[in-house]
Regions:
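An anion-binding loop in the catalytic cleft
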Residues: 103-214
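Donor/substrate-binding cores of folate-linked one-carbon enzymes
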Residues: 1-92, 96-98
Length: 214
């Protein structure tokens, strides 16, 4: 992470979960605290709008390796600088299994998308449908007045629908679910005791005509 932001065990995951646009890598001196040592070098990277934790992890691994080489060169050359972190920091604690369950009553479409991205490929965000555990691996978030969404749902009036209600489940058009603010479209999904697959293949074998995720 870009210290002192996200000290702790899961900085990459929390950057994605929180919908951050920028993260990065920091090299530092070790001390007695968790990620509290003086900083040496930093490198920023943009986080893609649809980028998952796994994808970002791979990019940062390469960047981190290159930054480490530069850091070691500076130490060897005697040009290294120590930069104190200061007290303006945030913590990135370990993820809990409980946070993987989607809370439809509190999270809007963008927050659910960030949850799905942040827990991919670790754990996977999930919900229950008809008592079965369904994992979401890739979703899109729409505002309710989005033109592209309107082309799919037509003139559907879903003002009386509750968060978690299925608006459309069609193997060709997709799976659309209402949230407290906005709509998500599920693109990659995993049924209970099944493998990950695109939503079209899933809907050809799993009937979701009406009902709600909870």
């Amino acid at each position: 992470s870009l210290l002192p932001k996200y000290r702790g065990a899961a900085p990459i995951q929390w950057a994605v979960l929180n919908g951050d646009k920028i993260t990065g890598v920091t090299t530092m001196y070790m001390d007695v605290g968790m990620d509290t040592g003086d900083m040496i070098l930093k490198e920023e990277v943009q986080i893609g709008e649809d980028e998952t934790t796994g994808e970002l992890w791979e990019r940062l691994s390469v960047i981190g390796g290159n930054l480490l080489v530069r850091t070691l060169d500076e130490i060897e050359n005697g040009t290294v600088k120590r930069i104190p972190q200061g007290e303006d920091f945030t913590i990135a604690p370990m993820l809990s299994k409980e946070m993987a369950k989607i809370d439809w009553q509190s999270k809007n479409a963008k927050e659910i998308k960030n949850l799905v991205r942040g827990l991919n490929p670790i754990m996977g965000a999930y919900s229950l449908f008809d008592g079965k555990k369904i994992k979401f691996w890739k979703v899109r978030a729409f505002d309710e007045d989005d033109v592209e969404l309107g082309k799919v749902l037509g003139n559907m009036d879903f003002s009386d629908k509750e968060a978690g209600d299925v608006l459309l489940a069609d193997s060709k058009k997709g799976l659309f679910i209402k949230t407290v603010q906005g709509v998500i479209s599920v693109e990659e999904i995993q049924g209970e005791n099944a493998k990950r697959m695109n939503v079209g293949d899933f809907l050809r074998g799993f009937s979701i005509e009406d009902g709600c995720f909870c």
